[in-house]
Amino acid sequence: MTASAIGTTSNWTPLEAKLAPELCAEFMWMYRDRGVEHYKHIQTRRYLRLDSVGRCMARQGDSFYEIPFDDEWKWVSGRSEGEENAIA
């Protein structure tokens, strides 16, 4: 990963398209790496990674691959099955 590949201007659009505003408030935008926005949950400290069209991504080594949003949201937010997740 090179310094030029890291974006430092926040982009909330992908997260706002997936979650209600009160749930977006649970995250901090951290950085963009190769088109993937990295949002850190304020309680769990886990990352939710979304690309520009809202696909949820996971990191494996230096690569990203797509994963189901609902599953990742539950893990990142610490919510369990059956809890209200208010996905937009």
State each model region's role:
Residues T2-A20, Q60-A88:
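Mixed-charge, Lys/Arg-enriched low-complexity segments
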Residues C24-D71:
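Acidic, low-complexity, intrinsically disordered interaction modules
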